Amino acid sequence: MFQIMLGCDLEERKYILEGTKNAKLAAWWDRAIDIIPKEGGKGTAIEQVLAHYKFSKEESIAFGDGENDMDMLLSVGKGIAMGNAAEKVKEIAADICESVTDDGIYYYLKSQKLINE
């Protein structure tokens, strides 16, 4: 099994992993979490893709808005929080772009001259 998605409140989270040792929580909303392998997650996946294609961390960029994106944002050269991101995500991000609904990724990439019109 790769992951389980679960709806719960903040108080219930502390009971979910009782008795487990090989899983961790990745919260992506205040009432929703993923249960994933302890050694897994978006950050681990990014690191493996970078290694496979022989890219350095500095050559990579990622965008995220949920707590489940935090390890991914820290695993790249430049982690960008979306404008609608949770405060915890914004605090660890290298930069913040506009929100998802305002096409934040497009306008950020355009402003950095990473894409053309």
Predicted regions, residues:
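Residues within well-formed alpha-helices
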Residues: E59-I61, K78, I92
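Conserved acidic, metal-coordinating active-site core of Asp-based
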Residues: M1-F63, E67-M72, N84
